[in-house]
Amino acid sequence: MMRKTKRNWTAAVCVLTAALSTTPVFAAKEKEGSTSKANTESISTDASAKDNGERTIIDHAGNEVTLPEEINRIVVTDTLPLPSVLSLYLDSAEKLVGISPVSMSAAKAGLLGELYPEILDADTSFFENSELNIESLLALEPDLVFYNAQNTELGESLTSAGLTAVAVSVTKWDYNAADTFDAWMDLLADIFPEEEEKAEAAKEYCEKVEDQIEEKTKDLTDDEKKNVFFLFNYSDTALVTSGKNFWGQYWCDAINAVNVGEEIEAERSNASVNMEQVYSWDPDIIFISNFTKAMPEDLYNNTIGDNDWSSVSAVKEEQVYKMPLGAYRSFTPGADTPMTLMWLAKTVYPDLFEDVDMTDEVQNYYDEVYGIELTDEQVAQMYTPSTDAANGYGISK
């Protein structure tokens, strides 16, 4: 693997629930927001400079945040994919001194820890039993702390402790992964303008992939559209899919497939279902997220709980797939969002995308946007993730 030369880059105790096992990156939806790309660009405004070198930005919660002149120590709390996006944006993880244990498990199991081994040295101990300890976070002496915009209580506690805190939204764009990724890149461009060209390149590449998929799938009839079931979490006691208010809906809409769980109104990871519903939907294809240890073989062999998958079309035709794990778990928005889109489209409609070589696509994307040359083996690793990717997150097998 080759990549561009990297740039070298205390208070009262307050324990807050971060709810890592259920909702840190999928917290309650904000009232404002739109799915339009115009709005993703308007949310993040140009930073205004002050005479003393400080700059102000508007974060995703609408807060005016004054940034320090130098940002050398960063903590990312409960926006789980952000450490990977930030590392690739900066082409370094050296500034990251603290991240969530759930972000760390993905870094260890996926590609991020290999590309930026320094991220494996980031502290995770400021989370104790899925709760965030402000005193432990303060001990890391961060110049900047990112937090989930929906966790307003945490944001208030961070600022009250004298920390510079920036809110990052995961729901403002109605679970549109591409728009959310674009907005994250816009925000990073405001904070770190020296890399703003990378933000534009990522957004343009994502739009290009969306356009390619639309062109190839636009003539599909309703009968030709595949029925897709997302298995977000699966264990002896849980069977959770993506309803209409979660990332699975966007992935299906973007590739002109049908999310069989669209009828479920529950938001985030709360769309629990039973096997009778799965039988009635009879999906053509099943995608298993990396937020669960379940693998395709578990459905083929009925090795989890008492459920029998043998009559489900996707299982009978061996059309069950584990989602990729590149820089982060690909079910959510992240640095790999354009490649997740292309992989989903090619997997669901192989005949329409027979000219697409995913190894070439991923290598070109990483090189063009991030300046990183991936080997064939590294790309293959992304598409054969282990069960370790789910470590630390919620209920697992």
Regions found by a protein language model. Give the residues of each.
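Short, low-complexity disordered leader/linker segments with a strong preference
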Residues: M1-E70
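Short, solvent-exposed loop/turn elements at domain surfaces
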Residues: V65-L67, L82-S87, S105-A109, D236-T241, ...
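Structural recognition of the beta-strand scaffold that forms the well-ordered cores
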Residues: R73-T77, V97-S100, L144-N148, A165-S169, ...
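Proline-aspartate-enriched helix->loop->beta-strand connector
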Residues: T124-N129, N133-Q150, N274-F291
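A contiguous binding-surface segment within folded domains or other stable secondary-structure elements
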Residues: N270-L325
